[in-house]
A protein has these predicted regions:
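Short, small/polar-rich motifs associated with maturation and membrane association
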Residues: 1-304, 309-311, 316-318, 390, ...
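A generic beta-sheet turn/junction motif
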Residues: 7, 125, 273-277, 286, ...
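Extracellular/periplasmic, surface-exposed regions of secreted and cell-surface proteins
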Residues: 41, 97-100, 300, 306-315, ...
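Short aromatic-centered micro-motifs
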Residues: 101, 552, 780-781, 824
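Conserved small-residue
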Residues: 157-244, 491-502, 506, 700, ...
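Acidic, glycine-rich flexible loop segments
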Residues: 213-251, 264-268, 337-392, 397
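Glycine-rich, aromatic-lined ligand/substrate-binding cores of catalytic
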Residues: 811-846
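Extracytoplasmic gating/loop element in the C-terminal half of outer-membrane beta-barrel translocons
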Residues: 838-946, 950
């Protein structure tokens, strides 16, 4: 038997788009990049670019969220390099900062990308690859190339595609179904109503019926019994159709009652035409989304116009305009409390298992007040803490719109000797408007808020490029010089009402009950006579840059690339606003040394060194006065409480990396391995100073963060025949992140902490990875970590709480990240699937803390190891088992076991600690699944309608969470910070995509 291994058509001379739009042969690059094809990004109709990249790029960590948020998520390349996050605060620093997104040469945001137009994505991971982007490329770059018409030939094409998906919520939380609402205790009994003088006459019919504690928003009530009838809260409401109706004392709380089936309809139409001297393409997309939360939805609209032509010999002109419109209405929010648009998390943290949510869909009484399950008493319908979830859905209206206008114009002239000169202008215009109205909810005044943001970011760039070969084409040379000017302008305004509305339901700033004066004393602009406060602000930034790159190659085997850039930035001190940096990389195509090895198709070695600087946000160096409270008609102002170090220097990142890439066995097996080390020094941070200085903090250079890690990508085609093909790819990455030094006398820098129950903090600590977690309240333990038990006044052994010792409990940083994808083609059918995973990385769950503290969680019920009820009496073998030790008189400890009453343990002890609710964030999640049928050419030709290609696909996004170490929440949807404070419900989408090309 003779076995022949067919080679793959993988092109080893692929041309990729690198920094500043320069096109290079992939074999010549001395740094790590990863290109993802359109088919791997758009097969399931992902709505966001970052969602589509999840698990497909080695070293890229995807930080996502629920589909109910209509959010694009973000990616982080190679960990964090800063002690402050993207927004300038420390809280998100350990999560890392995002790369820049460059769409057809224009720096914009991931939110501005229309996935229907994406042709390819090239991810530049390190400073050596992104040095030509200057300060903005320090965290990597995602280079997006959109579809073009085929310039240089007569061509005309129309493409129509539609993706229709249905989205459902799925609930991770496991609730106990044995005990009801209130705080009576497991052995308690429901109260019995007896009519009395002063009660409504209609209540006489309710005499003798049972009810419970409606006001206590927990589930520590009596055991369920289907033989017992009781009056739910709504049964006391004479205006309700449920008046006087009893329910069985059983579990009625079903979280699925909170949601509806969402629908997303995405249609794209594109037209392209080209000839010898011109090309043009127009693309239009419209997407309407109905959310899984009632009264929620989103709109996405895109337009893309690309044209290029040659009016004169050697002169090429191109123009590109992209428009993006995004509107979100009542997108789910996350957080602890009742103000968020997230009744799901609210009910998981505080709720009653006996409540039938459907009874409260009609939440408005004839007098305009709201019904709720959480009334104060049967004769007081005022909500104790919580409104009907349907009131929250409908009486909070939170709408935001974002508009992106991305423009680029380019003119290039070809001179003799392969020299080209060009000029490019790009502009990224951004408009944001948010309107928030809240009416009549519990314990909250009616409010009207408006936020408005506008910005433009304009680049003017001149360039000279040269590309030639010498010495019988053995020596190749490329060079480019750029001069660039950037103007950035940002302005915003915030207007809030104060102390409620004069006329309920009239949401206008002029309808504010209170006058201005500012609940927010940090406002930095004039406060006027309307609203809670009226805050307006403007930021401007200018930068001048001169940079260039040179690439030399010998025998198509050896390559060296050098780049150099100097920036002058307006946000830095005059004496330090100029900074020079650059990079050097080398590559050798080692497979050319072993041409006799037929099994070795391609092998490259590479190494690089680079530096890149970063600047401040505008006005951080200025001592400015801010407007504060208004006293009558007199405005007040206060100075900046921060001391500014006038010698602040730019932050500098220095990076080294080495790597190799290969392809063997007829390009049937390929891989890429990379190791990097990255030091970021001169961190610009705010440190505390003594009160005698007259300031509260000091802005200064301090800190060195070191990132070291590796990235491995492997792929192969075990099967490749005419009718069968199987492709499999996987990647894994490890990043070791450490704070090496801080300012003299400093050993730690606070990154995050909870605003309530402030016993858990995240620090950047010298000698440890970023995001070290400490608690200041924990179980009291001996040196072996055993819980110490002591007798209370009743003589029962109880676990002790240590309120004085700071305890290290782990780190936020994951140990490994990666992904896996596969595609199987059988004739004209192709099955695709992709997953991503994370190993390690701690986070704290508020949801789990209050699931147990409120008695909702399944862990608070059931039986213990003695066969008794966890909520039963200790004397009857009930209670929660706690293993620990007791102290002996000689200072030693002996093992001991005790049982603690469930409410005392979960609500009085455990839920006052953070340590039990800090979890390993490891997970494996299937992100995409699709089955596509591509109509064969023979069938298309028989239709005689000009159809060039046609396909239909079954698609699914986020269909399964395959593995998780934590219950009740989804670790893949934490936002990358320390706390999960109340997740929006997880979603999965299923549907169909049809694609036609004429």
């Amino acid at each position: 038997m003779k076995v022949v291994l067919l080679s793959d058509s993988k092109n080893l001379d692929d041309v990729v788009v690198t920094a500043q739009g320069l096109k290079r042969q992939k074999r010549s690059l001395g740094y790590a990049t990863q290109e993802i094809k359109s088919s791997d990004l758009t097969s399931v109709g992902q709505q966001g670019l970052n969602n589509a990249l999840a698990g497909k790029v080695a070293g890229a960590r995807f930080v996502g969220g629920s589909g109910a948020k209509f959010d694009e998520g973000k990616i982080v390349l190679r960990g964090t390099t800063s002690l402050s996050s993207d927004n300038g605060t420390a809280a998100g620093a350990a999560a890392g900062s995002s790369p820049i997104y460059v769409v057809d040469g224009v720096i914009t945001e991931a939110a501005a990308v229309n996935m229907n137009d994406v042709a390819s994505v090239n991810v530049l991971k390190g400073p050596a690859a992104t040095a030509l982007y200057g300060v903005r490329g320090g965290n990597g770059a995602v280079i997006i190339t959109t579809n073009n018409a085929k310039e240089g030939e007569a061509h005309q094409q129309i493409n129509i595609s539609n993706t229709l998906t249905w989205t459902t919520a799925y609930n991770h939380a496991k609730l106990q179904k044995e005990y009801g609402g209130g705080a009576y205790g497991a052995d308690g009994e429901l109260d019995v109503y007896h009519w009395k003088e002063g009660d409504p006459e209609s209540y006489k019919q309710l005499d003798g019926k049972k009810y419970y504690d409606y006001a206590d928003d927990c589930s520590w009530g009596p055991r369920f019994d289907s033989n017992i009838k009781y009056l739910p809260a709504i049964a006391w409401d004479e205006t309700s159709p449920y008046f006087g109706q009893e329910d069985t004392w059983t579990s009625h709380l079903d979280m699925n009652d909170l949601f509806q089936t969402g629908v997303a309809d995405n249609t794209n139409v594109s037209f392209e035409r080209s000839g010898k001297d011109f090309s043009s393409r127009i693309s239009l997309s419209n997407m309407n989304i109905k959310g899984v939360n009632p009264n929620s939805g989103a709109i996405r609209r895109y337009a893309n116009i690309k044209t290029a032509f040659t009016p004169l010999k050697n002169l090429r002109v191109s123009f590109d305009y992209k428009y993006t419109y995004k509107k979100n209405h009542n997108a789910a929010t996350e957080g602890y409390g009742t103000e968020s648009n997230n009744p799901y998390s609210d009910l998981l943290q505080w709720g009653q298992t006996n409540v039938n949510l459907k009874q409260y869909k009609n939440y408005t009484r004839p007098d305009g007040s709201f019904r709720t399950w959480n009334i104060k008493d049967y004769n007081d319908f005022t909500p104790a803490f919580h409104d009907s979830p349907y009131a929250v859905y409908n009486e909070i209206n939170n709408t935001n719109t974002r508009e992106f206008h991305v423009l680029a114009g380019d003119i290039e002239y070809s001179l003799p000797y392969n020299i080209k000169v060009g000029f490019k202008t790009t502009a990224n215009l951004y408009n944001f408007y948010q309107l928030y109205n809240r009416a009549g909810l519990t314990g909250q005044t009616d409010i009207h808020k408006q936020w408005q943001r506008k910005s433009y970011d304009v680049y003017n760039q001149g360039r000279i490029t040269w590309d030639d070969k010498f010495i019988n084409d053995r020596l190749s040379a490329q060079a480019a010089i750029f001069i660039e000017n950037r103007n950035y302008h940002y302005e915003g305004m915030d207007v809030f009402t104060r102390d409620g509305l004069l006329l309920p339901g009239l949401f206008r700033t002029t309808n504010s009950y209170g006058l201005s004066g500012g609940d927010d004393a940090s406002t930095d602009a004039t406060t006027n006579e309307v609203g809670d406060y009226d805050k307006a602000y403007t930021r401007r930034e200018k930068a001048q840059s001169l940079f260039g790159t040179v690439t030399l190659g010998w025998d198509d085997t050896y390559f060296v690339d050098a780049s150099l850039r100097n920036d002058w930035n307006s946000t830095l001190p005059t004496d330090n606003n100029s900074y020079l940096y650059g990079g050097l990389s080398v590559a050798a195509v080692a497979s050319n040394w072993f041409k006799q090895a037929k099994w070795l198709d391609y092998w490259k070695l590479r190494a690089s060194f680079a530096q890149v600087g970063s600047a401040l946000t505008p006005y951080r160096l200025s001592t400015v006065y801010n407007f504060g409270y208004r006293y009558g008609s007199t405005a007040s102002m206060y100075g900046n409480p921060q001391l500014i170090d006038k010698n602040i220097k730019p932050t500098i990142t220095t990076s080294y990396e080495i790597g190799t890439e290969f392809s063997v066995l007829g390009n049937r097996l390929w891989g890429d391995i990379n190791y990097y080390s990255r030091d970021t020094k001169n961190q610009i941070i705010s440190t505390t100073v003594g009160p005698a200085s007259g300031y509260s903090s000091r802005l200064m250079n301090a800190g060195l963060i070191r990132n070291r890690g590796y990235e491995i990508s492997l792929g192969g085609k075990p099967i490749k025949t005419k009718n069968y093909e199987w492709t499999i790819e996987a990647n894994i990455a490890h990043n070791e992140n450490k704070l090496v030094e801080l300012a003299p006398g400093m050993t730690r820098y606070t990154l995050d902490g909870m605003s309530f129950f402030s016993y858990l903090y995240s620090y950047a600590e010298v000698g440890k990875p970023m995001g070290a977690l400490y608690v200041t309240r924990s179980w009291q333990t001996n040196e072996n970590g055993d819980i110490i038990l002591k007798k209370n006044k009743a003589g029962n052994l109880m676990p002790q709480i240590d309120k004085t010792t700071e305890k290290y409990i782990g780190n936020m940083q994951p140990k490994l990240t990666g992904g896996f994808s596969t595609a199987v083609r059988v004739y004209d059918f192709t099955l695709r699937a992709s997953c991503d995973f994370r190993v390690g990385g701690k986070f704290a769950s508020v949801t789990n803390m209050w699931l147990e503290g409120s008695g909702l969680g399944s862990a608070t019920a059931g039986t213990n190891d003695r066969g008794g009820e966890i909520r039963g009496d200790i004397s009857e073998n009930g209670g929660v088992r706690v293993d620990g030790v007791v102290a002996n008189e000689d200072g030693t400890y002996s093992p001991a076991t005790t049982y603690v009453e469930a409410n005392t343990y979960f609500n009085g002890l455990k839920s006052t600690l953070w340590e039990p609710y800090v979890y390993d964030g490891s997970y494996i999640k299937m992100r995409e699944l699709s089955l596509t049928y591509n109509m064969p050419k023979t069938l298309l030709n028989q239709l005689h309608i000009g159809l060039q290609s046609a396909s239909i696909a079954f698609v699914a996004t986020d269909p399964f969470l395959l593995y998780s170490k934590v219950k009740n929440v989804d670790p893949s949807e934490t936002d990358g910070t320390l706390f999960e404070q109340g997740q929006a419900v997880s979603t999965r989408s299923w549907g169909f995509t049809v694609n036609l090309t004429f």
